[in-house]
Amino acid sequence: MSDPNQPKPTSERHVPVLKDRCINLLAPGIEAARQRGETPVVIDATLGMGGHSEALLQRFPDLHLIGIDRDEEALALAGERLKPFADRTDLVHAVYDEIPDVLRDLGVSEVHGVLMDLGVSSLQLDERERGFAYSFDAPLDMRMDTSRGQTAADVVNNYSEEDLVRIIRKWGEEKFAGRIANRIVAAREAKPFATTGELVDTIRAVVPAGAAKTGGHPAKRTFQALRIEVNEELDVLERAVPAAVDALAMGGRVVVMSYHSLEDKIVKKVFQTGSKSSAPLGFPVELEEHKPELKTLTKGTEVPTADEIAENPRAASARLRAVERIRARRAA
């Protein structure tokens, strides 16, 4: 009988979202590499606890996987999980917009697949001391990379009221941003914020109780905004998606799962731009360099099935998009 006080194995703590669909979407890019006599290389740009990577390595015995994560704890756990495949993996402590640097350091010129599973991980939500969750009291941190950068406490204690309104409204899409920012500034004058519980209580005091019926937990949107600000998530994503596309070999694929509309808008824009002709309006012919570089593989976004959501409730808000490179990369 297992000891309830012992941490669960990584495989039990993390259920990969849309795992089978992700693997099936990446498979043709891997097969295209094989047909050219190349060793297939796939980047898991948001490695987390390694669930998607483990499944890829199990299915494709000749695959070389590059796993990237900014969270050192996640890298360590994934490293343990992927030990049986150590000779076919490179695990790198980096942010996923650093794909070009990672590939250069590894001597890799192009890859045949890139997977991105955005947002906060199960590990980060479950580890109380990380401060990502509003459901229990913890230090107000929210850094995905705990080795550097400002914390959520730094943001709420030092940002001006105007800046707090801006990020809570923009990143959290919170209609009560003004009320929340005003109360935060008033409360921190008496005592700086140190824990998530203190912040939750402050938000509860100004968000109408009825708002929770449609918007969920009153602190949900503010916590999202702070997490995005602390980790510069959307700025990173705006650089990361084009970098992933640029790294693709012919026939290679990028698969991205996003969890809120702000992320999905960025992914959609890059994919749509690459999937359209770049010929000037009214141009009489479409030259080769004007033809689309990408082919869209999903009609809009794909979502988890009811069965998958029942097994893994955190998958409920996942939205998947995928593209394939159909024209060679432009020369640098």
Swiss-Prot record:
It is an enzyme of class 2 (transferase). InterPro entries: RsmH, SAM-dep_MeTrfase_MraW_recog, SAM-dependent_MTases_sf. SUPFAM superfamilies: Putative methyltransferase TM0872, insert domain, S-adenosyl-L-methionine-dependent methyltransferases. It catalyses: cytidine(1402) in 16S rRNA + S-adenosyl-L-methionine = N(4)-methylcytidine(1402) in 16S rRNA + S-adenosyl-L-homocysteine + H(+). Its EC number is 2.1.1.199. S-adenosyl-L-methionine binds at G50, G51, H52, D69, L103, D117, Q124. GO terms for molecular function: rRNA (cytosine-N4-)-methyltransferase activity. It holds the Pfam family Methyltransf_5. Keywords: Cytoplasm, Methyltransferase, rRNA processing, S-adenosyl-L-methionine, Transferase. It is found in: Cytoplasm. GO terms for cellular component: cytoplasm. GO terms for biological process: rRNA base methylation. PANTHER family: 12S RRNA N4-METHYLCYTIDINE METHYLTRANSFERASE, S-ADENOSYL-METHYLTRANSFERASE MRAW. HAMAP family: 16SrRNA_methyltr_H. Specifically methylates the N4 position of cytidine in position 1402 (C1402) of 16S rRNA. Belongs to the methyltransferase superfamily. RsmH family. This is Ribosomal RNA small subunit methyltransferase H. It comes from Arthrobacter sp. (strain FB24). The gene is rsmH.
